[in-house]
Amino acid sequence: MKKEYWNKPTMDLWDRLYIFEVIRGLCITGSVFFGNMWKWLTFRKGALTAYYPEELRADYSSANRGRHLLTTRADGKVQCVSCNMCATVCPAYCIEIQSAADFNDPFHPKSPDRFEIDYSRCIFCGFCVEACPEDAIRMSKDTPNFPGFDRENMWATQDLLMNWQPASDAAKSYPGSGQAHQEVHP
């Protein structure tokens, strides 16, 4: 036996057919389609596919996170102390650090022997920058051309991360960046 509820809405035949809702949905879809079609016919920008190599996106947010940078100390060595906090907090597991001991330096007994970031896995979340206790890793605001045809070019080594200078970044000055700004691609 089917239960009857006291607050059950009663629907007549017109409500159960949903004709009004179907027509309303078709009107919304049609208006968006024909609006975009009109923009396309009049050579204005509509909600169409951007053809990547020919059309580059220029409307990035001011809070955009770009390529990673390793800061350096006054003596030219990397500021990283190989604590692995950035690699631990990374949700994509794209940072690989291999530590080396330097017993001659009493203030920085550990330094990275190998520091690499796999950009094919990086999601540019910025957690590594927030987790670093030494402010050794930063992210530029530039949007360099990342896509490539092989995965070897998607790995950023320690030398590249230390020597790559962003073309423009008004957020902070970078320690040890007395050179002219130049862009170095992997």
Curated annotation (Swiss-Prot):
Q: Which residues bind [4Fe-4S] cluster 1?
A: C80, C83, C86, C132
> What does the entry's cofactor note say about binding and number?
Binds 2 [4Fe-4S] clusters per subunit.
Catalysed reactions listed for this entry: a quinone + NADH + 5 H(+)(in) = a quinol + NAD(+) + 4 H(+)(out)
Tell me its cofactors. [4Fe-4S] cluster
Q: Which GO terms describe its cellular component?
A: plasma membrane
Pfam families, sorted:
Fer4_7
This enzyme's EC code(s): 7.1.1.-
Determine the domain of life of the protein's source: Bacteria
List the subcellular locations.
Cell inner membrane
- Where is each 4Fe-4S ferredoxin-type domain found? 70-100, 113-142
The UniProt similarity line reads: Belongs to the complex I 23 kDa subunit family.
Subunit-structure text: NDH-1 is composed of 14 different subunits. Subunits NuoA, H, J, K, L, M, N constitute the membrane sector of the complex.
Q: Mind telling me what this protein is named?
A: NADH-quinone oxidoreductase subunit I
Organism annotation: Pelobacter propionicus (strain DSM 2379 / NBRC 103807 / OttBd1)
